[in-house]
C-alpha cells in the first residue's frame, strides 16, 4: 500500500500552479518483483506496477549492486523506464478547459504511454543491529508529452533523499 499525496495549488512558490486547483490524493497498491541473474544479486531486473484511484504506472528496470555485502547494504545503480495510463498522466501533467481559463495556461490532454527514463543510485548501511541509513539520488528524463506540458518546468526531474529503515 502507498499514498499519493496529490498536488496543492500552493506547492509552487512562484505561482506556476495558480488556477489549477488541487490534484486529488489517493491510495495505491504497489506490486513489485525482482529477478536476479546470479546468486549474489549483482545484476537484476525489477518490475513494478502501481495502481490506484488516481491512475496507474508500470516501471521496468535493471540494476547492479556493488560491493561484497550480502546483507542488503552497499550501493546500487539502476536504470528504468516508466509508462503511465492517461488518467495518471493528466492528473500529474494535464490541464482541463476550466483550469486553462483559471490559470491562463494552454489546455493540455495527455494520452497514456511512455513517461520517462530514469537513473537511480541508492546506498544503505547499518548504523546498529536494526537500523539502516538510506540515501538516494534520482534523475528522471521525461518523454515529449510530459516535457511539453505547461506544468513541467523542464524535461527532467532530480531528487535527493535520505531516510532510515528499521529491520525486524
Question: Where are the regions that the model predicts?
Answer:
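Outer-membrane pore/translocation modules
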Residues: 1-78, 87-112, 152
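A conserved mid-domain beta-alpha-beta active-site/ligand-binding segment of alpha/beta enzyme cores
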Residues: 105-118, 124-126
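Outer-membrane beta-barrel "beta-signal"
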Residues: 62, 155-168
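Structural signature of outer-membrane beta-barrel domains
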Residues: 2-6, 50-52, 82-88, 132, ...
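Residue-level detector of the transmembrane beta-barrel scaffold of outer-membrane proteins
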Residues: 42-44, 74-80, 132-136, 161-163
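Strand-connecting loop/turn motifs
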Residues: 38-42, 70-74, 126-130, 157, ...
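Low-complexity, intrinsically disordered Gly/Pro/Thr-rich segments
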Residues: 144-151
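Transmembrane beta-barrel architecture of outer-membrane proteins
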Residues: 27, 56, 83, 115-117, ...
Amino acid at each position: 500500500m502507498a499514498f499519493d499525496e496529490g498536488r496543492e495549488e500552493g506547492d509552487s512558490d512562484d505561482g506556476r500552479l495558480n488556477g489549477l486547483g488541487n490534484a486529488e490524493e489517493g491510495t495505491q497498491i504497489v506490486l513489485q518483483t525482482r529477478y536476479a541473474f546470479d546468486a549474489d544479486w549483482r545484476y537484476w531486473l525489477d518490475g513494478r506496477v502501481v495502481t490506484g484511484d488516481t491512475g496507474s504506472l508500470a516501471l521496468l528496470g535493471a540494476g547492479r549492486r556493488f560491493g561484497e555485502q550480502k546483507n542488503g547494504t552497499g550501493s546500487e545503480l539502476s536504470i528504468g523506464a516508466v509508462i503511465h495510463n492517461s488518467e495518471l498522466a493528466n492528473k500529474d501533467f494535464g490541464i482541463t478547459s476550466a483550469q486553462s481559463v483559471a490559470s491562463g495556461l494552454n489546455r493540455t490532454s495527455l494520452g497514456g504511454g511512455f513517461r520517462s527514463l530514469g537513473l537511480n543510485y541508492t546506498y544503505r548501511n547499518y548504523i546498529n543491529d536494526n537500523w539502516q541509513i538510506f540515501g538516494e539520488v534520482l534523475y528522471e528524463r521525461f518523454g515529449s508529452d510530459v516535457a511539453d506540458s505547461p506544468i513541467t518546468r523542464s524535461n527532467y526531474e532530480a531528487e535527493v533523499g535520505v531516510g532510515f529503515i528499521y529491520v525486524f
